[in-house]
């Protein structure tokens, strides 16, 4: 597969090259994202226009690639740090700093999947199976370990895990009750 980055350091395109038998075939090109991933900061003045700096590649090894982008707006700035692993996992840290007193209404990351890559769903309260046409009604619940969602099909998909600075990986199986997730600070 291939990941292409937008100027802000977030994925603009994720392409899977697998056939129906789950065999790699470079002649097949199936897009996972319908639109580039968007990081949005909404203030009382409206949506902040974040202008990205040039992508700075910090480190590259045979197994990882790390980069950084600074996003500057009129009232806030954000730092996007990313590390891509050999298996396609990308860990992002998005840190937002107010440049002056500002009322923030919402901070969100928007992932628009293609129909191809959103046949099945699991997480955020959905037990797994075909993706419903309705909106998912979800709220943080530390008992239910609902901090992630996966959308995809047999050949492609994407899992998004929500973390903050106090994130602690949940325990599984018989230890489930002893390792509940923590509410995020924000």
Question: What residue spans do the PLM features occupy?
Answer:
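Beta-strand/loop-rich accessory regions of lumenal/periplasmic or secreted enzymes
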Residues: 2-186
């Amino acid at each position: 597969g291939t990941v292409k980055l937008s100027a802000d350091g977030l994925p603009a395109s994720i392409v899977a090259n697998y056939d129906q038998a789950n065999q790699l075939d470079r002649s097949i090109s199936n897009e996972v994202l319908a639109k580039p991933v968007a990081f949005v900061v909404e203030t009382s003045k409206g949506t902040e226009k974040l202008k990205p700096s040039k992508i700075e590649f910090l480190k590259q090894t045979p197994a990882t690639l790390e980069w950084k982008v600074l996003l500057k707006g009129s009232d806030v700035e954000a730092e996007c740090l990313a590390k891509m692993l050999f298996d396609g996992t990308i860990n992002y840290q998005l840190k937002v700093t107010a440049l002056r007193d500002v009322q923030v209404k919402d901070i969100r990351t928007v992932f628009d999947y293609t129909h191809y890559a959103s046949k099945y769903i699991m997480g955020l309260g959905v037990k797994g199976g075909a993706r419903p046409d309705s909106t998912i009604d979800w709220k943080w619940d530390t008992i239910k370990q609902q901090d992630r969602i996966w959308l995809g099909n047999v050949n492609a998909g994407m899992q998004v895990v929500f973390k903050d600075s106090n994130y602690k990986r949940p325990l599984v199986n018989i230890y489930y009750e002893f390792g509940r997730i923590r509410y995020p600070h924000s």
